[in-house]
């Protein structure tokens, strides 16, 4: 099959401090990732790549366009970008469903609309930034009872706040990451089991709790000799030790539906020492 993949990139300065950018591209992929889950309370993923064929695994086709405007002056960078993406040829096997569509095999497309916004400021030894992302991501599988519904990765809002301070040989950083919860599918309350199977609500009609994580780190550079330098660093992941649920699914156990939650790491210190010859 003959495939054309055009690209478009236009940048234009607007005065001294503004710039507008328009991007567009077509892409294709001849392999698709198949995700299978161990059918128990562990829910362990088994991933493999499979070549596209003429039957149940089509060639993935991506169409994407974006338009952005940025402002840069006196250490300030302010940027906003809107984008649209449509991906045809995705399969249910590749999306990691753990609900009523876990064992369904069909193909469809994914539409994503979003906006990214960032503000960054450099001031003396400080470099600080704030970013916000909005996204609306939907699946369409025409062979499913619900043709269109939110995608498994439809994280509607995300905020990142960070700063670092550098003085001499020492660099100290801190960051905050927050996002609204991932979509999830819950059983029908009061009628959780029907015909021996879990009776689910509409696909991805609920969300997990919001995700919040604070990290800090410090890195010190020094010399061991004229020809050898070293880096000594310490970092703490999830400083507040917050319990963040990153996935939730359901299984039948002793004729009752049980929820299985997967949590991210709690407070996790790390220490590094690197020698450069």
Mark where each language-model region is.
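Residues on the lipid-exposed face of transmembrane beta-strands in outer-membrane beta-barrel proteins
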Residues: 8-12, 57, 67-71, 115-121, ...
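Transmembrane beta-barrel architecture of outer-membrane proteins
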Residues: 2-6, 24-28, 61-65, 73, ...
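Outer membrane beta-barrel strand-and-loop segments of large Gram-negative receptors
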Residues: 54, 58, 64, 77-131, ...
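C-terminal beta-signal and adjacent terminal beta-strands/loops
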Residues: 88, 178-194, 212-213, 218-277
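Transmembrane beta-barrel strands of outer-membrane/channel proteins
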Residues: 22-26, 69-71, 80-84, 130-134, ...
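Surface-exposed extracellular loop regions of Gram-negative outer-membrane beta-barrel proteins
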Residues: 16-65, 82-102, 175-196, 242-247
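Gram-negative outer-membrane beta-barrel transporters
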Residues: 84-86, 105-188
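Short loop/turn motifs that connect adjacent beta-strands in outer-membrane beta-barrel proteins
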Residues: 17, 75, 125, 169, ...
């Amino acid at each position: 099959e003959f495939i054309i993949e055009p690209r478009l990139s236009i940048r234009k300065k607007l005065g001294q401090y503004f710039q507008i950018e328009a991007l567009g591209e077509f892409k294709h992929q001849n392999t698709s990732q198949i995700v299978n889950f161990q059918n128990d309370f562990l829910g362990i993923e088994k991933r493999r790549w499979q070549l596209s064929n003429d039957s149940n695994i089509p060639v993935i086709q991506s169409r994407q366009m974006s338009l952005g405007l940025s402002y840069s002056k006196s250490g300030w960078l302010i940027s906003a970008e809107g984008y649209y993406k449509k991906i045809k040829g995705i399969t249910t096997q590749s999306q990691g469903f753990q609900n009523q569509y876990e064992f369904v095999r069909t193909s469809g497309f994914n539409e994503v609309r979003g906006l990214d916004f960032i503000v960054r400021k450099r001031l003396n030894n400080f470099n600080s930034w704030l970013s916000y992302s909005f996204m609306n991501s939907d699946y369409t599988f025409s062979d499913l009872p619900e043709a269109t519904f939110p995608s498994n990765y439809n994280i509607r809002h995300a905020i990142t706040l960070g700063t670092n301070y550098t003085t001499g040989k020492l660099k100290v950083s801190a960051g905050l990451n927050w996002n609204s919860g991932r979509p999830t599918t819950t059983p029908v309350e009061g009628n959780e089991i029907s015909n021996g199977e879990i009776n689910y609500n509409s696909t991805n009609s609920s969300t997990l709790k919001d995700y919040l994580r604070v990290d800090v780190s410090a890195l010190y550079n020094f010399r061991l000799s004229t020809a050898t330098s070293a880096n000594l660093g310490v970092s703490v992941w999830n400083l507040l030790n917050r319990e963040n649920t990153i996935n939730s699914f359901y299984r039948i156990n002793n004729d009752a539906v049980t929820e299985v939650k997967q949590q991210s790491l709690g407070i996790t210190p790390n220490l590094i020492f690197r020698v450069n010859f």
